[in-house]
Amino acid sequence: MDLLSGTYIFAVLLACVVFHSGAQEKNYTIREEMPENVLIGDLLKDLNLSLIPNKSLTTAMQFKLVYKTGDVPLIRIEEDTGEIFTTGARIDREKLCAGIPRDEHCFYEVEVAILPDEIFRLVKIRFLIEDINDNAPLFPATVINISIPENSAINSKYTLPAAVDPDVGINGVQNYELIKSQNMFGLDVIETPEGDKMPQLIVQKELDREKKDTYVMKVKVEDGGFPQRSSTAILQVSVTDTNDNHPVFKETEIEVSIPENAPVGTSVTQLHATDADIGENAKIHFSFSNLVSNIARRLFHLNATTGLITIKEPLDREETPNHKLLVLASDGGLMPARAMVLVNVTDVNDNVPSIDIRYIVNPVNDTVVLSENIPLNTKIALITVTDKDADHNGRVTCFTDHEIPFRLRPVFSNQFLLETAAYLDYESTKEYAIKLLAADAGKPPLNQSAMLFIKVKDENDNAPVFTQSFVTVSIPENNSPGIQLTKVSATDADSGPNAEINYLLGPDAPPEFSLDRRTGMLTVVKKLDREKEDKYLFTILAKDNGVPPLTSNVTVFVSIIDQNDNSPVFTHNEYNFYVPENLPRHGTVGLITVTDPDYGDNSAVTLSILDENDDFTIDSQTGVIRPNISFDREKQESYTFYVKAEDGGRVSRSSSAKVTINVVDVNDNKPVFIVPPSNYSYELVLPSTNPGTVVFQVIAVDNDTGMNAEVRYSIVGGNTRDLFAIDQETGNITLMEKCDVTDLGLHRVLVKANDLGQPDSLFSVVIVNLFVNESVTNATLINELVRKSIEAPVTPNTEIADVSSPTNDYVKILVAAVAGTITVVVVIFITAVVRCRQAPHLKAAQKNKQNSEWATPNPENRQMIMMKKRKKKKKHSPKNLLLNFVTIEETKADDVDSDGNRVTLDLPIDLEEQTMGKYDWVTTPTTFKPDSPDLARHYKSASPQPAFQIQPETPLNSKHHIIQELPLDNTFVACDSISKCSSSSSDPYSVSDCGYPVTTFEVPVSVHTRPPMKEVVRSCTPMKESTTMEIWIHPQPQRKSEGKVAGKSQRRVTFHLPEGSQESSSDGGLGDHDAGSLTSTSHGLPLGYPQEEYFDRATPSNRTEGDGNSDPESTFIPGLKKAAEITVQPTVEEASDNCTQECLIYGHSDACWMPASLDHSSSLQAQASALCHSPPLSQASTQHHSPPVTQTIALCHSPPVTQTIALCHSPPPIQVSALRHSPPLVQATALHHSPPSAQASALCYSPPLAQAAAISHSSPLPQVIALHRSQAQSSVSLQQGWVQGADGLCSVDQGVQGSATSQFYTMSERLHASDDSIKVIPLTTFTPRQQARPSRGDSPIMEEHPL
């Protein structure tokens, strides 16, 4: 398939290339003597013309044989198919190629033109004529005589004349044979260098002239063709006397050149031969061999005696350029000498070029006829120029003598195509006589000329042209038929029938006109009426007689001139106008419309009123009628007059019309009541009147007419009980119901009478007083009631005037007074109840006001906080409060050594220990609502208070306190975290409920500036009264670590617990030790903290249990002997990487700040178990430092929120494994937020709240849970806890003996699943006899040993 496709593409490309070149050659092979109508080839297939893309051809493809006029071609070609056939002419190779050497091929050439011009190509076809054996070889003579000396040696050879065969190749002479030689002679054949075969006679026996002097035999020559042809000749051998020597040529081969114009007698060459004999035997005779052609014998002369060769006739190189002359030199013997003379005739420019015209377009009487509309490049003839001369003498060019719309385009050597170079135009040039010139390149050049005649045939390519492009004619109307209007004319540039023009009316021409077909005269055949048609616009056509005919048109405009032949015409014969009677004077009554079909002045109409009527005027131009009077319908209802209309024609025409003006009534009168005559009249209605009885009739009249006078009645007021009804047309008032006692009295009925006028109806009203009673006993009272009713406004709810119930007003007043009294009493009662309920709150507010000097909230939040306090219901705690006080010192940041200003805050305290004992530590949590945005919640731990009993005998010097650094812009209230004032409210300033005495403690505290970031833990020293732990935190957390910035002040808060307090602050759990103990460490710490510094932090924010926002994880345990003062400086990154917006505003707390992890060697089960009991944030943090299996197990047991957080920070393998056990919501959320390499920097931190109660079931701890560490006293035993020894973490069930330093860890427990608060139980050092016992679940309760 690929091969076929490639072949097809190659053929297409070849066809395109060939056709683009414009000329092509094709070779065929034919044999001579072929019969007629033998198929030679198919040009359509052989030239791949069927592969040419299908083009839109003007005519079908045509093949035309181009040959010279008078020639008889040997072949013919089918014009439609391109098939080539032989003709009846004989194909004779020997005749066609007589002058060429025998060793050259014989060709016959013709040209074929492929039409039409869109695909024109000229193809030269060369036919190679193959020789057939149609000629027999012949000897020069039928009898060959030869003489042989009798002393010829045996095997001597004597050359015989050669036979000649016109055929070539195998069909030529191939063999000779000697017949009847009597064994005396034999025959041998030799081949000359030119390829000729020469017979030689061989002497086979000794000759004896005396015995026999003559031998006669036959010699036969044969060719090699099929069938084989041969001929014979008689060979007569004469035996002569002995001849000892033979002639010898001095030169056996001679080649000479002689110009073809050499004159006759010119010596060609001189031959020299010698013979050693003497006498007669020495005489040499020169002669041409019988192999020399007849042409050579005719052109050259050989002197038999001297051997001189001369020109006998003029030479012609173009006829025979080379001649071979075989010369024999004989001394009379039988062995002549041979010499070959080769004569080359050189060319001279003796031949003029010849011009051969072969027509592609068949001529008529030697003239080519071309249509003027033939396309460009139309091929006309093939011009072949030849020159018989050689080289540059035969190089010919051809051209025309002057500028003509034709050109010669070369296609083959010395062949040119004559084609059109421009469009022909019969109208400009009708005939062309083209002179063709041909010149060779010889010196001097020779030229030749020929004439070619072309006649242009006219085509109908020109349409008639009118002399006018637009014809305008005017004619008056009312004309006589047959009037000639105008004559139109047109010309045509064509000739003959193409120029004959006929005139026709266009299809849009009206029937009123006619046109002469030959002359173009336009005539009106009907009477024209301008009022029907004022103009005519139509076309006239001019059509020639060509094929196809061509037409053109001209527009004719006929304008009709008007005549005053029409009178003005009113739109109506009679006009009736209706005007209201209130039409003002000179108002518009109406419009008279008049038309006149004429034009111009003939249609200018003027209007006027006849009979000199002065009551009305009419505008003469517009026809508007206006009154000069005021109308009164009652005086005159209509007016009549005539209007005249007259045109402005030369002979004017007029007409008139009747006008009637009718005055129309206007609704300008209201109905007037006749009955009742006034509003003061009344009608008596007896209570016994039956329903449906007409009790009264109102009558109203209207002075208008028609609908304006039609009156309708209706009740529009009074009649509140619907006791009466009125007929809208008659005005009869009918009683609708039976009257009872309540209906007695004067009824005031408002009756409306309105007309039906349009567009606005007019109306009047009247009061109809109907007195329902048995009789009129007191006319004065009735008249008074009527008078009062007239003075009172009338509404649809007008009540009746009851003469029998004068006390009704007093009853209404009494009812209103009672209702008002009851309302006042209810309002007073409600007010008292409300104030009673608000009394406790008012007292609490008063106390808050009294304590405002030491508890002042942030100014921006004061108003909002106070509003919250009023709205929330406070929960009251037991009446006990620890003794606390806070001292806040502020200094300028730029003066480090300044003493600063001391500010003392007074806090309420209660020193009674019995009160403390009443507080329920277990049931009263110190948690806050998670969404509370206040400072107290921010700095307060979210865990409930631990349940333990504080011993009152704890000495003051054993109490621990911690300094907490707070943001400068926050006011921290030092109210007890487990007190009533803050345990149940999110308001951090709700201290007014702490209704206890106030004791003031004042402790001086030095102002600290922020130490450098690389400062390590201070040395810890024992304190007698109190121990201070100071932690500095920059007020504004930043993302980048930086040192102390000058100009920013710091603040610290010191919390103290006095002697005898029931609550103490917690420290880091340090016992008695020296400063050197701080340097010991067991493993690396995160964030660059020193080991001791990290573990000595009481809370992430260094807050104490003794303030109002204490951290439960730092709960004090009785028995601690000493505390330490440390300063921890977390970097800015430590305090801000996991900060929330609340932390950035209020400062850092355990809600947002998380210390780094401690250990990386945790048990998988312990990690998973711890995560299952940790809050979401801790679980997510743990995920970051746990091995994959632990992460997956932990995630499967975590609540959805924890799973989502952890998944978002876990690597992809963990996410995939955990998601298999996660709910759909967690899967979708985690996958959406988890990056490919999920890591979170926040996982490096974990607050103390994240410790899990499940830690009791495994020895190792999760590596990311932040654990507190404390130093153990000697001889300490614990029921439950863990210690870090040499072998790692282990349970302290066995107890820790001796003075070895041990590290203990806290535990935490979630109260319930929905609560974010974590109860943290710190395990710290114990004095002897102290132990930890289990409490709720796994949370131990620390208590003093019984001893």
Swiss-Prot record:
Lipid bilayer topology: Single-pass type I membrane protein
Glycosylation sites: 27, 48, 54, 344, 553, 773
Record topology, Extracellular segments: 24-812
Cellular component aspect of the GO annotation: plasma membrane
TM spans (from-to): 813-833
Main location: membrane
SUPFAM superfamilies: Cadherin-like (SSF49313)
Domain annotation Cadherin: ranges: 26-139, 140-249, 250-355, 362-466, 467-570, 571-673, 677-795
Record-linked CDD domains: Cadherin_repeat (cd11304)
PROSITE patterns for the chain: CADHERIN_1 (PS00232), CADHERIN_2 (PS50268)
Origin superkingdom: Eukaryota
Signal peptide coordinates: 1-23
Keyword annotations: Calcium, Cell adhesion, Cell membrane, Glycoprotein, Membrane, Repeat, Signal, Transmembrane, Transmembrane helix
Residues on Cytoplasmic side: 834-1347
GO terms of biological process kind: cell adhesion; homophilic cell adhesion via plasma membrane adhesion molecules
Function: Potential calcium-dependent cell-adhesion protein.
Protein name: Protocadherin-11 X-linked
Species whose genome carries this gene: Gorilla gorilla gorilla
